[in-house]
Amino acid sequence: MSTVVETVTALAQPIVAQHQFELVDVEFVKEGKSWYLRLYIDKPGGINIEECALVSDEVSEKMDALDPDPIPQAYFLEVSSPGAERPLKKPADFEKAVGDYIHVSLYQKIGNSKVYEGTLLSLTADSLDLEVNLKGRIKTLTIPRDAVAQARLAIKF
């Protein structure tokens, strides 16, 4: 799967950049019996449906021209906004999220949990500081960057 994601990322990045959009993420997943190629794009102020359709048309045209086809099976191409809970993947994503409420999944437990939600206070090249509510007490938790399996913005209720 990663070769599909890498190929599509390399193909889509210049198309997205040409329109001054950001390619947030690319996924190639099977759900039920169907395969989905998903591109998440964004720009300051948010992306609209016409912009998603534009990128979808251009990426689809480029994908159809590739020989050999990197995706031999049938699939659905979806281009959309990353939404309110956008993933944090690149260092720049984390830098933009300082001060925001985020969800972090870890490879192994730190303390008593593999999942934390809290406000991202600061980050370094090696770690991030997260202000979390642990049983009614506000604590600052330092999480090594290499312990983070996934991170995304979160909505605080």
From Swiss-Prot:
The UniProt keywords, alphabetically, are: Cytoplasm, Ribosome biogenesis
The organism's place on the tree of life at top rank = Bacteria
Any one GO biological process: translation
Q: Which Pfam families match?
A: DUF150_C, RimP_N
Naming one, the record's GO cellular component terms include: cytosol
Signal sequence residues: none
**Compartments where located:** Cytoplasm
Summary of the function given for this chain in its UniProt record: Required for maturation of 30S ribosomal subunits.
Q: Which NCBIfam families match?
A: PRK00092.1-2 (NF000928)
So what family is this one in?
A: Belongs to the RimP family.
What is the official name of this protein in its record?
Ribosome maturation factor RimP
Look up and give the organism this protein is from.
Levilactobacillus brevis (strain ATCC 367 / BCRC 12310 / CIP 105137 / JCM 1170 / LMG 11437 / NCIMB 947 / NCTC 947) (Lactobacillus brevis)
What is the phylogenetic placement of the source species in the record? Bacteria, Bacillati, Bacillota, Bacilli, Lactobacillales
